[in-house]
A protein has these predicted regions:
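A conserved mid-protein helix/loop that constitutes part of the nucleotide-sugar donor-binding site
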Residues: 1-11, 23-26
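Short alpha-helical segment that forms part of, or immediately flanks, the ligand-binding pocket
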Residues: 49, 71-75, 89-90, 96
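Short hydrophobic beta-strand element within catalytic cores of glycosyltransferases
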Residues: 79-83, 92
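Nucleotide-activated donor-binding/catalytic signature segment of Leloir-type glycosyltransferases, i.e.
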Residues: 26-46, 50
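Acidic donor-binding loop of glycosyltransferase active sites
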Residues: 53-65, 78
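A charged, aromatic-enriched C-terminal amphipathic alpha-helix characteristic of glycosyltransferases
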Residues: 104, 122-170
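Short alpha-helical donor nucleotide-sugar binding micro-motif in glycosyltransferases
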Residues: 50-55, 144
Length: 171
């Protein structure tokens, strides 16, 4: 819902850099005011990271099961203003690493931007970066491995318990 970000920032006269492309770009450009800049797709990872590092905040108005871009922004120490549904509810800590807005409307996002401008966030850039590390690939692999080992141990114990019962029944 990039359209919400474009409309909210146009209404508030706030600078917004839109990175990426797609079939909606002509429509987005038509609704954009003079404070909206479109970079298109094809930027290198380093260029995108540079924008994350310089951004005051990152707007994530869509709803996704997880959504990697809020975590990427936080890995640069950038607070995230996200629609409070889906994966953003796990990756964004309201008032600390960013804010949630309640409805997917221009008004709700604009209110969230104004609250962020007024109140800021409690976490420093380094604390936001540290929070993003809790979503690392290494952590995921470690926790998945630990889970599998626990389940295997439980399963092994169940097999041992079952073999005991079967032996008694055979005797």
């Amino acid at each position: 819902r990039v359209d919400l970000a474009v409309q909210a920032c146009t209404r508030l006269n706030k600078r917004l850099v839109v990175i990426g492309g797609g079939g909606e770009m002509d429509k987005l450009r038509a609704m954009a005011g003079p404070t909206i800049e479109f970079k298109g797709g094809g930027l290198s990872d380093e260029e995108v990271r540079s924008y994350y590092l310089r951004a005051k905040g990152f707007l994530f108005p869509g709803e996704e099961d997880f959504g990697i871009t809020p975590v990427e922004a936080q890995s640069a120490g950038t607070p995230v203003l996200a629609y409070g549904r889906g994966g953003a509810c796990e990756s964004v800590l309201p008032g600390k690493t960013g804010y949630w807005f309640k409805e997917q409307t221009v008004e709700s996002l604009a209110d969230c931007i104004e609250r962020f401008e007024r109140d800021g966030v409690a976490c420093s850039k380094e604390e936001i970066r540290e929070h993003s590390r809790s979503f690392s690939e290494e952590r995921f692999e470690r926790e998945l491995k630990e889970y599998c080992l626990r389940r295997m141990a439980d399963w092994q114990q169940e097999l041992l318990d079952c073999s005991h019962w079967e032996k008694e029944e055979l005797d």
